[in-house]
Amino acid sequence: MENVVIVDAVRTPMGRSKGGAFRQVRAEDLSAHLMRAVLSRNPSLDAAEIDDIYWGCVQQTLEQGFNIARNASLLAEIPHSVPAVTVNRLCGSSMQALHDAARAIMVGDAHVSLIGGVEHMGHVPMNHGVDFHPGLSRSVAKAAGMMGLTAEMLAKMHNISRQMQDEFAARSHQRAHAATLAGYFKNEIIPTTGHDADGVLTRYDFDEVIRPETTVASLAALRPAFDPVNGTVTAGTSSALSDGASAMLLMSESRAKALGLKARARIRSMAVVGCDPSIMGYGPVPASKLALKRAGLSVQDIDLFELNEAFAAQSLPCIKDLGLLDSIDDKINLNGGAIALGHPLGCSGSRISTTLLNNMERRDVQFGLATMCIGLGQGIATVFERV
């Protein structure tokens, strides 16, 4: 099988969904902007050579509907001969796009793929038009469709206290702010035009969502968001609502060499698993274990992890059961995570993979693992190896 390599990985800044920087920018434009950026950064690649475009998006309606992958590629003026498909595995959509493209390359059906994802949660809210089948309640708890309550369940099962959650969430904002000041995001963020609070066109090259003033004390003052009486999960310990897109350029190792393009990493293994919807946030544990097994590696072999922070209450049980509690500050989400940066659903999989690759290069390490929980009980993981 062909080795699959990552040639490039970029993202937009993350904008606040409520009246944020991208309130007047459509999801297709965020996507097309990145598609154009990837091509301009890799001039030796003729856009007509792209075999397929895989683009993650969850709420595929309104501006995100009718195959946003194709709409965005047309906006980006990619040749009409290049096909495009929109992928939906809820929170794991753009990582699933990565997996789909990688498999096509592995078996020789493709040599070049552009992947990524987008979600404009300000324009198309997460629960827009959702209508669960009433028959689901025969086999699945009704609360399993409410992500915050699944996080509450995990917190209770794993004895994750409110204090632990507040500390983890504060760390996310502090790390993300420190990474911004240090310029660690510069290599992955493509400056993107939006509007400031006064409506003036502004070029954003930083994440608007991060709240550097966040402290454990300020988080402790927040009320539980999902279980007002007995709950511990607050808005402050949940992933922020944000708008954004991310993209990666995948190639067979042979094609990258032929084009004179430097491979940043290869995909070592991939995995997707299912789990009980009531504890959907636990999905990264079995997914990571399966991906590691397929890679012939152990948790100890992995130098850096990116775990999508849907909630502090679900991240901490995953970290605990992967045996990484003592390694958080050395190995996990070094630049913060979704609690600070937000979780634009269709964007996050390739966003965390992009951040992981940059951290692997900055720290000069060999192996990295990106993993996410997925609504309704799934987990997805990818192991990367630098080349």
UniProtKB/Swiss-Prot annotation:
Transmembrane regions: none
A molecular function GO annotation: acetyl-CoA C-acyltransferase activity
PROSITE patterns, per database record: THIOLASE_1 (PS00098), THIOLASE_2 (PS00737), THIOLASE_3 (PS00099)
GO cellular component: cytoplasm
Enzyme category, top tier: transferase
Listed SUPFAM superfamilies: Thiolase-like
Pathway: Lipid metabolism; fatty acid beta-oxidation
InterPro entries from the UniProt entry: FadA (IPR012805), Thiolase (IPR002155), Thiolase-like (IPR016039), Thiolase-like_sf_Thiolase (IPR050215), Thiolase_acyl_enz_int_AS (IPR020615), Thiolase_AS (IPR020610), Thiolase_C (IPR020617), Thiolase_CS (IPR020613)
Keyword presence, Hydrolase: no
Primary location class: cytoplasm
GO BP term, pick one: fatty acid beta-oxidation
Location of this chain's protein in the cell: Cytoplasm
Known EC number: 2.3.1.16
Residues at the active site: C91, H343, C373
Entry similarity comment: Belongs to the thiolase-like superfamily. Thiolase family.
Complexes and interactors: Heterotetramer of two alpha chains (FadB) and two beta chains (FadA).
Protein role: Catalyzes the final step of fatty acid oxidation in which acetyl-CoA is released and the CoA ester of a fatty acid two carbons shorter is formed.
Record-given protein name: 3-ketoacyl-CoA thiolase
